[in-house]
Swiss-Prot record:
UniProt feature, compositional bias: Polar residues: 114-126
Location, primary (coarse class): host cell
GO cellular component, one term: host cell membrane
The protein's name: Uncharacterized protein VP12
Biased segments, Pro residues type: 139-155
Membrane-spanning intervals of the chain: 50-70
Composition-biased stretches (Basic and acidic residues): 96-113, 127-138
UniProt keyword annotations, A-Z: Host membrane, Membrane, Signal, Transmembrane, Transmembrane helix
Membrane-topology annotation of the record: Single-pass membrane protein
Organism: Colorado tick fever virus (strain USA/Florio N-7180)
Length: 185
């Protein structure tokens, strides 16, 4: 559910911001506090200050990026690319087939071709229909037609050429500038 994912992403983001704030407070404490200067942590921070800052900032950036992915609803293609080998991709990318019980649809012992198939999958147009859908020799129509991916032809009133020739505007005259008080010679 996108709402739950977005709420979870916001929660994780709040935790990350709190964790980053705690890191900066501890860093300032060990760097500036007189009693903590003689500890091994303060010595390590002093010797490797730039490296520690770069590594910590980079890791927080990666965590913020991954947390941001939680809040976005990914397209089916992006889900397949990112979660290609996980079961969550199959679960998130399936289509409920009508007139077939879920037990029959997901039965691994069944040899029929009734399975969960993505709308955008090439298999959606190539799979043969079973006896629930009609003639088994008739191929299923494609999920999307090619016309969905190409722009429609332009309307004639948009591409109309004017009957009169157009003249390019000329450069402004000097009198235009002197009238405004610029005072060009």
């Amino acid at each position: 559910m996108p709402c739950n994912r977005a709420v979870f992403g916001a929660f994780v983001l709040a935790l990350l911001i709190s964790l980053q704030s705690v890191y900066f407070k501890l860093y300032e404490f060990y760097k500036n506090n007189e009693t903590a200067r003689n500890t091994s942590v303060a010595g390590f921070l002093k010797r490797h200050e730039v490296a520690v800052n770069v590594i910590v900032e980079f890791s927080f950036d990666i965590l913020f990026f991954l947390c941001g992915l939680l809040g976005f609803e990914l397209s089916p293609t992006a889900r397949r690319l990112i979660f290609r080998r996980t079961a969550s991709a199959e679960k998130a990318d399936t289509v409920e087939l009508e007139h077939v019980s879920s037990r029959r649809r997901n039965d691994s012992r069944d040899d029929s071709t009734v399975r969960n198939v993505s709308k955008t999958s090439p298999l959606a147009s190539q799979r043969s229909r079973d006896h629930f859908d009609g003639d088994p020799r008739e191929p299923a129509p494609p999920a999307y037609s090619p016309a969905d991916f190409y722009p429609p032809p332009a309307s004639p009133h948009i591409c109309e050429t004017p009957l009169s020739t157009r003249v390019a505007p000329s450069a402004p005259s000097a009198s235009l500038f002197t009238a405004g008080g610029i005072g060009l010679p």
